[in-house]
């Protein structure tokens, strides 16, 4: 029995219709139907506010952020924008685009943590705009808005968009490459109508039309920037998505089920060649080389081949062939990591993949929708599958797959909601149940960590209430029809992610003790200390030292002690284990002047310096010494 309900709230992504058992007419695939007002404004404002909330003042957290930030600062200070250097040592782990972006922000806004993180935030916004464009053109304006905000509102994107790392920049470039290439065959859905033919863009028996030369050059230039960002994967990755997708479209358009196996094989070969011709490989490669090659050649000449050898052989081939830096995992690592990284939208991702696969293989699905879903599924599979085969694994390696996941979830969710299929469905109940579980897990994780070295962060556990309350709002909206449950889901994801990577993360980052220890060393030295480390050094120490840090290995204890005795402004950072090795031979007048316990470590980091400094200076340091 149909139930009446009030008109839904006037949300920019709501569908204006009852959401109980009544089935309002679904908007057409080309976006005709309920008007969606100002989608660009909605996405830009919502994304900008969410990203801004995440910019709480906090020190660099992991090992990568301070390392990359220090390289960019060195470029700005030395004027050498070609050779990346870290602590006066050649840095071969990443190309130069990220460092250039950070250094440019340093020049505009000063050298600090927030300017180093601005490029990632702008890149995340650029990816959201690409998803808005793709979702709108390939499905509907509502799908475009939901896809863009689902991207902004998932946990790993929130983290990477506020990190001084290259992954958000790489994802923006690869997403725009994929979208611009696919548009030529997907095009505005109105041109494809709602026909269910095999492909309205590629006529039967014909090769796909080639990319316009200008667009091919633009895609190649973006690929060149991606190669400058993270190496060959930035160019190869999008092509590994587009080429098989175009070939599949051409093969389906010309397929004759009654033909012999030999003829079908020849048709498949023609489709593959047509896909290669479609991308205009000569223009594409020349444009990529025009952007990327000058720097690669310059850095190779300046370093006598050391930088290219280290980057390509160690950080590309080496990382793929063997685990590096203890970053290993099984074949399902990235699939499981996405359940956390794509949260809260990951709670609906498995169901959305099943529905999208079913829709993409049905002949009665409108051709534009079928092609768009097929592209999204292939896009997701290529990036996740390729890095699942690599030996070295980190969750951020598959960040370029997250835009595809956002499109798949958005297309599925908007279709089901617009059809009025959310009156107590099992899929919604299951998904919201996992959303609630994620909120409980967030709170529990922070509370447990607070008992194991993460002090003063108990209040950050409140962020776990957001998914719980948001899931309740989604469920109530679906049952009562008073507002759009999809709008509630978008809202909870943005609020949760914004708070989790902003105020909550700032509380957690306060437990990062190494920056405070380095500042204490500077104060002990009367302004600027000359720092050395014995046995262990970290990028955090190098960045906050604001100068060169001598790194002494365990077998170099004599040199470390001689260095410590070289002046009153020289301090030595050691672990408790390292101190036990050198303590009997410490120079006269030196000793422990400060210590902190790094997060989740069993021992302290210690400052060894002059103990006969003036009392006022000692008083300043003892306030932070336990």
Predicted regions and their residues:
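Membrane-embedded architecture of ER/inner-membrane glycosylation machinery
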Residues: 24, 33, 217, 221, ...
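Membrane-integral, polyisoprenol-dependent glycosyltransferases
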Residues: 2-4, 10-12, 20-422, 595-596, ...
